[in-house]
Amino acid sequence: MARSIKKGPFIDDHLMKKVLKSKETKDNKPIKTWSRRSTIVPDMIGLTLNVHNGRAFVPVYVTENHVGYKLGEFAPTRTFKGHKGSVQKKIGK
C-alpha cells in the first residue's frame, strides 16, 4: 500500500542532512548510507549514494527517473544463481 500524500515522503533525518550538506559544498564524494527505506527526493539528483545491501555498499547514481523510489530498490540483497538444469539441456542435444 502506498504512503499517504498528506504525510509526504519518508527520508531519514541523518541522510537528508548529509544530502543538503553535500549539495551546499558541491562535494562529489559518495554518501554512505544504511537507510534503504528512505525515498529518493529531487534534492538527491546528481549525487552518488552508497547503499548497503547487507554485505557491501552498492553505488547508486541518482537521476530524475529515480525520484519517488526507495533507495533499497537499487541495491539488490540476493544474488540469483539460476535453477539447476539437466545435463542434456546444457550440452544442447
Swiss-Prot record:
Q: What does this protein do?
A: Protein S19 forms a complex with S13 that binds strongly to the 16S ribosomal RNA.
To which protein family does this belong? Belongs to the universal ribosomal protein uS19 family.
Ranges annotated as spanning the membrane? none
Biological processes per GO annotation: ribosomal small subunit assembly; translation
One protein family per Pfam: Ribosomal_S19
Keywords in UniProt for this one? Ribonucleoprotein, Ribosomal protein, RNA-binding, rRNA-binding
Which top-level group of life is the source organism from?
Bacteria
Give the organism, scientific name: Wolinella succinogenes (strain ATCC 29543 / DSM 1740 / CCUG 13145 / JCM 31913 / LMG 7466 / NCTC 11488 / FDC 602W)
Please identify the protein, giving its name as recorded: Small ribosomal subunit protein uS19
Recite the lineage of the species.
Answer: Bacteria, Pseudomonadati, Campylobacterota, Epsilonproteobacteria, Campylobacterales
* SUPFAM superfamilies on file: Ribosomal protein S19 (SSF54570)
Cellular component (GO) terms are: cytoplasm; small ribosomal subunit
The record's GO molecular-function terms, alphabetically, read: rRNA binding; structural constituent of ribosome
Q: Which InterPro entries match?
A: Ribosomal_uS19 (IPR002222), Ribosomal_uS19_bac-type (IPR005732), Ribosomal_uS19_CS (IPR020934), Ribosomal_uS19_SF (IPR023575)
